[in-house]
Amino acid sequence: MSTSRLLLPTTNQQQNSSPVIKEVDLNQNTPIPVVWQKTKKPPFVSFPRHEPSETIVISSKPRLFSFAKKIKPEAEQRKRKRTTEI
């Protein structure tokens, strides 16, 4: 029997420069710490060294959401400008 395991790179307080790999057993219901970073730039996969707490940044979904939130107000302003110009 092979147990499915997931390796999670995390940062450690003592070793700021190198990420620490933690082994998580997927068969047990252990909570995996996931942090959605609120950044101004669209976030790429990064393991921030300045944060002492263990964080995992997942880039694909939050990038889309933060990007959509950013573009929406700008698009609304453009629409308003068009209507006022005409």
From Swiss-Prot:
GO terms for cellular component: cytosol; nucleus. It comes from the Eukaryota. This is Uncharacterized protein C794.15. It comes from Schizosaccharomyces pombe (strain 972 / ATCC 24843) (Fission yeast).
